[in-house]
Amino acid sequence: MYKMEYSYLNSSAYESCMAGMDTSSLASAYADFSSCSQASGFQYNPIRTTFGATSGCPSLTPGSCSLGTLRDHQSSPYAAVPYKLFTDHGGLNEKRKQRRIRTTFTSAQLKELERVFAETHYPDIYTREELALKIDLTEARVQVWFQNRRAKFRKQERAAAAAAAAAKNGSSGKKSDSSRDDESKEAKSTDPDSTGGPGPNPNPTPSCGANGGGGGGPSPAGAPGAAGPGGPGGEPGKGGAAAAAAAAAAAAAAAAAAAAGGLAAAGGPGQGWAPGPGPITSIPDSLGGPFASVLSSLQRPNGAKAALVKSSMF
């Protein structure tokens, strides 16, 4: 067992020390302690009893027994604790608020970076280190620049694709609108006019008056140079060119008159067929040329046969 060799803890010396102390100062310093006089009620039996009455602590006097001397013997429990443990959180907040200064690239650096980016979008570590050494930057800054540049490139590609799709949709919409307009115009042109009169007859009425003389038309018998069967028209080459021209004009006039008469008898154009041809009474004798023999053969008493032959010829 350890022996306590603190001589000032002797009962007589302790009582004399406590009697000489100013308890008011002790109470004011430590408010939680009621009074130091309570310690006098405890009896301390020292292990060593070799101290005599004259062997008390001569250095402990009422003047020297004070709060300071007792406090010196107490060891501070926070002596080994570092100072930074009890610092406030203001320093941590300041460190969090401190951000890295934004890197500002020069035009020469950007030019060199863009040149390498045009060659490859994903440079390896050796290329990045060489480029960083060349343009006086760190490899980390070069790597971050390439990451941002790739993101910008992808964004530009998406914007270009969206613009191309919008332009394509706009052109297709315009084409469809123009085709619809053309179709509507064609539909309007093909629709008949509901407010107008009857349209033209798709099957025009054939005019039979020119071939054999229509009903009501003048007969070519009265034409100059015409003659009966016994007249002088039997000689084919006698009229000459003037007579042939006059006969042709007379025949044209007769055909026009016959056509007009046929239309009048039918009640207007497109209302019905013209009446059948009337019998041919006579044919001008002055018509010469290669058809003279045919025309002379038509001058026969049988009018029905002559009309049939002439209608088949024309």
Swiss-Prot record:
SMART domains for this protein: HOX
Designated name of the protein: Paired mesoderm homeobox protein 2B
Residue ranges of DNA binding: 98-157
Keyword DNA-binding: yes
Compartments, record wording: Nucleus
Subunit structure: Interacts with TRIM11.
Segments forming a coiled coil: none
One annotated Gene Ontology cellular component of this protein: nucleoplasm
Tissues expressed in: Expressed in neuroblastoma, brain and adrenal gland.
Gene3D superfamilies associated with the record: Homeodomain-like (1.10.10.60)
GO term, biological process aspect, one: enteric nervous system development
Organism, scientific name: Homo sapiens (Human)
Biological function: Involved in the development of several major noradrenergic neuron populations, including the locus coeruleus. Transcription factor which could determine a neurotransmitter phenotype in vertebrates. Enhances second-messenger-mediated activation of the dopamine beta-hydrolase and c-fos promoters, and of several enhancers including cAMP-response element and serum-response element.
Associated disorder: Central hypoventilation syndrome, congenital, 1: An autosomal dominant form of congenital central hypoventilation syndrome, a rare disorder characterized by abnormal control of respiration in the absence of neuromuscular or lung disease, or an identifiable brain stem lesion. A deficiency in autonomic control of respiration results in inadequate or negligible ventilatory and arousal responses to hypercapnia and hypoxemia. Neuroblastoma 2: A common neoplasm of early childhood arising from embryonic cells that form the primitive neural crest and give rise to the adrenal medulla and the sympathetic nervous system.
Pfam families per record: Homeodomain
Domain of life: Eukaryota
Compositionally biased residues, Gly residues: 210-240, 264-275
MF terms (GO), sorted A to Z: DNA-binding transcription activator activity, RNA polymerase II-specific; DNA-binding transcription factor activity, RNA polymerase II-specific; RNA polymerase II cis-regulatory region sequence-specific DNA binding; RNA polymerase II transcription regulatory region sequence-specific DNA binding; sequence-specific double-stranded DNA binding
Chain intervals for the UniProt region annotation (Disordered): 162-246, 259-289
Record family assignment: Belongs to the paired homeobox family.
Gene: PHOX2B
Amino acid composition bias (Basic and acidic residues), ranges on this chain: 174-191
Keywords: Activator, Developmental protein, Disease variant, DNA-binding, Homeobox, Nucleus, Transcription, Transcription regulation
Compositionally biased tracts (Low complexity): 162-173
Matches recorded under PROSITE patterns: HOMEOBOX_1 (PS00027), HOMEOBOX_2 (PS50071)
InterPro entries associated with the record: HD, Homeobox_CS, Homeodomain-like_sf, Paired_Homeobox_TFs
